[in-house]
């Protein structure tokens, strides 16, 4: 471990002690919001503290074993214990380094998934449908809930656009690297000559804003339109203008919801999405400024960035953000088996963050 990382660990240990003192302060105890916030911070530091305690024990074991090595009768046993202690220290060193990677407070939360057909006409809409189905299948495997908020079906299948809310613990942490342009190479079902076509769809992953991130929206900045829903809900939705479209005039952000039977329920859902979009827009500005000073290999969240190619003739998926990340398992991945792909992206992100921490930036 580099000296820079070691200093950061020591700073976290000091912060933990400080938090323990603060949480026993009557003034803090009487302030529910502050107490809850500090308690959450302390709980996040516990894994670091436990690993550092384990490291101290392993160092003590190593010192004891090295002392035994001077005794001829104990030398063989000492050598074994030295090797075991060194292996444990190496393991803890890697574990502590990963614990230093900043934890995104949004990781455990829900998200909004937006998939839009790009270039490629009908085939792009069909591919957008395939991508949405892939994420829905993955969510089902994770035990998450997928709620479609609005959709615009393609003429020959798939979607011109579909927006859904994904509800489940850790949803954002697993899908946050999916934002960007996804490209497909395959022979469309509508192609009679057997030629391979290239088309694209864009994906946006937007974390749901929580109560702490509540922002104030001036009602005068909103343009609200109602229209007849084309979504689910039976005949009722086509008879009344229950669907809602809200435009935030200053930013140009537009959200729709048409899945609920009442206009009020659709408005509540649309406002929730609007708040999430505006919070994420502010974060994106900050991330763009940060990206000027360091390279972000994974997770920039830019939906215009081409991140992945799905080549059906070769049965492979290539992620262009990570060198050498090509998987020849397209049939299973497109059916929602994303674990191997997501694991590689998470590993790359952690390595990127550790490199940044080691540089002290």
Curated annotation (Swiss-Prot):
Keyword rRNA-binding assigned: no
Modified residues (N5-methylglutamine): 235
Cysteines engaged in disulfide bonds, as pairs: none
Entry keywords, A to Z: Cytoplasm, Methylation, Protein biosynthesis
Organism domain of life: Bacteria
GO MF terms held by the record: translation release factor activity, codon specific
Gene3D superfamilies: 3.30.160.20, 3.30.70.1660, 6.10.140.1950
A GO cellular component annotation in the UniProt record: cytoplasm
Post-translational modification: Methylated by PrmC. Methylation increases the termination efficiency of RF1.
Subcellular location field: Cytoplasm
HAMAP family attached to this UniProt entry: Rel_fac_1
Protein family: Belongs to the prokaryotic/mitochondrial release factor family.
Function: Peptide chain release factor 1 directs the termination of translation in response to the peptide chain termination codons UAG and UAA.
PANTHER family: LD18447P
Protein name: Peptide chain release factor 1
């Amino acid at each position: 471990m580099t000296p820079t990382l070691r200093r950061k660990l020591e700073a976290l240990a000091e912060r933990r002690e400080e938090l323990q003192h603060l949480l026993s302060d009557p003034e803090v105890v009487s302030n529910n919001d502050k107490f809850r916030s500090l308690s959450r911070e302390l709980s996040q530091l516990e894994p670091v503290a436990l690993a550092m305690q384990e490291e101290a024990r392993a160092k003590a074991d190593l010192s004891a074993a090295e002392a035994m090595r001077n005794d001829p009768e104990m030398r063989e046993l000492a050598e074994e214990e030295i090797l075991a202690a060194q292996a444990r220290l190496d393991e803890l060193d890697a574990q502590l380094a990963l614990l230093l990677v900043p934890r995104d407070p949004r990781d455990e939360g829900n998200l909004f998934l937006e998939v839009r057909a790009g270039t490629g006409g009908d085939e792009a809409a069909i591919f957008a449908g395939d991508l949405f189905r892939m994420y829905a299948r993955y969510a089902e495997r994770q035990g998450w809930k997928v709620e479609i908020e609005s959709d615009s079906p393609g003429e020959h299948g798939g979607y011109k656009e579909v927006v859904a809310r994904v509800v489940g613990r850790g949803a954002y942490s697993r899908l946050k690297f999916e934002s960007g342009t996804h490209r497909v190479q395959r022979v469309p079902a509508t192609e009679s000559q057997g030629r391979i076509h290239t088309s694209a769809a864009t994906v946006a992953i937007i974390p749901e804003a929580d109560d702490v991130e509540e922002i104030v929206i001036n009602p005068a900045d909103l343009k609200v339109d109602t229209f007849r829903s084309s979504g689910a809900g039976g005949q009722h939705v086509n008879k009344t203008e229950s669907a809602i479209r809200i435009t935030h005039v200053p930013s140009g952000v537009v959200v729709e919801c048409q899945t609920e039977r009442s206009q009020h329920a659709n408005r509540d859902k649309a406002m929730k999405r609007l708040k999430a979009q505006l919070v994420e827009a502010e974060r994106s500005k900050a991330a763009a400024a940060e990206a000027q000073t360091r390279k972000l290999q994974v997770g920039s969240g830019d939906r215009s960035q081409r991140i992945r190619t799905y080549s059906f003739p070769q049965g492979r998926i290539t992620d262009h953000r990570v060198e050498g990340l090509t998987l020849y398992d397209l049939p299973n991945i497109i059916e929602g088996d994303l674990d191997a792909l997501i694991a590689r992206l998470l590993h790359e992100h952690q390595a990127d963050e550790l490199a940044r921490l080691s540089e002290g930036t």
